[in-house]
């Protein structure tokens, strides 16, 4: 039995609140249970130096956690003067995941930055950031389309979403909360497109290596979960 009472293949309640920020071209407050992340997409009419005069645009991401997003207050990374390794790893993952479904040539020489700020953390902040970040990116592109800058269906090739899976109490489970994640025997993150393409898989065993059979079970849970998340994304943007 999972501490939350959920079934092994049951995700937490997921919700998207679009246009949460009045200033950003695109924004979304995403909730995976008690994990809440504000994702904003900001458009700039410039590209990184290595892309100048290439005709291509860029999509990148930054990630951070509010000091009291966790049980005890964390010091702001800005106060330390540098980002931690975990932060850099996560924001690169978010950027890679979103670029996987964007035609950078069709975007033109512009940059969209996704800022993913964790308001409350209870496990799965990176997967929530990717899934909610796609909504914010979509709304930013719709904003651009309304100003005759691009066509959304030419720039955005597919949905992308992410979910965590792991082995907890010797059982493969989906969408681990913090209590499960902190004591899981295996922890994995899956990023996939709406068409089922694999963007990234991160998997780590804690102490005991996991078997190919266990990995196959986790992969099956992830595919079903991401299918549900993509359906929720479609429902959110249709509203």
From Swiss-Prot:
GO terms for biological process: rRNA catabolic process; rRNA processing; tRNA processing. Pfam families: RNase_PH (PF01138), RNase_PH_C (PF03725). It catalyses: tRNA(n+1) + phosphate = tRNA(n) + a ribonucleoside 5'-diphosphate. InterPro entries: ExoRNase_PH_dom1 (IPR001247), ExoRNase_PH_dom2 (IPR015847), ExoRNase_PH_dom2_sf (IPR036345), PNPase/RNase_PH_dom_sf (IPR027408), Ribosomal_Su5_D2-typ_SF (IPR020568), RNase_PH (IPR050080), RNase_PH_bac-type (IPR002381), RNase_PH_CS (IPR018336). The keyword Transmembrane does not apply. Signal peptide: none annotated. PROSITE patterns: RIBONUCLEASE_PH. Keywords: Nucleotidyltransferase, RNA-binding, rRNA processing, Transferase, tRNA processing, tRNA-binding. It comes from the Bacteria. Phosphate binds at residues 86, 124-126. Phosphorolytic 3'-5' exoribonuclease that plays an important role in tRNA 3'-end maturation. Removes nucleotide residues following the 3'-CCA terminus of tRNAs; can also add nucleotides to the ends of RNA molecules by using nucleoside diphosphates as substrates, but this may not be physiologically important. Probably plays a role in initiation of 16S rRNA degradation (leading to ribosome degradation) during starvation. HAMAP family: RNase_PH (MF_00564). This is Ribonuclease PH.
């Amino acid at each position: 039995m999972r501490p939350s009472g959920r079934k092994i293949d049951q995700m937490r309640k997921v919700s998207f609140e679009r246009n949460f920020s009045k200033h950003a071209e695109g924004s979304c407050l995403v909730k995976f249970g008690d994990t809440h992340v504000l994702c904003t997409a900001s458009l700039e009419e410039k590209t990184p130096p290595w892309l100048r005069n290439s005709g291509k645009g860029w999509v990148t991401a930054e990630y951070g956690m509010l000091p009291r997003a966790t049980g005890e207050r964390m010091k702001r990374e800005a106060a330390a003067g540098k980002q931690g390794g975990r932060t850099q790893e996560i924001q690169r993952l978010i950027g890679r995941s979103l670029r996987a479904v964007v035609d950078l040539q069709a975007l033109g020489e512009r940059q969209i930055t996704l800022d993913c700020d964790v308001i409350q953390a209870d496990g799965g902040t990176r997967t929530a950031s990717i899934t909610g970040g796609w909504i914010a990116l979509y709304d930013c592109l719709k904003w651009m389309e309304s100003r005759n800058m691009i066509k959304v269906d030419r720039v955005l090739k597919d949905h992308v979403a992410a979910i965590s899976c792991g082995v907890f109490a010797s059982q493969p489970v989906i969408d681990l909360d913090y209590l499960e994640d902190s004591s899981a025997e295996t922890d994995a993150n899956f990023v996939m497109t709406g068409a089922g393409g694999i963007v990234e898989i991160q998997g780590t065993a804690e102490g005991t290596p996991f078997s190919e059979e266990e990995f196959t079970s986790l992969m099956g849970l992830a595919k079903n979960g991401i299918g549900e998340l993509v359906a929720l994304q479609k429902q959110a943007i249709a509203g």
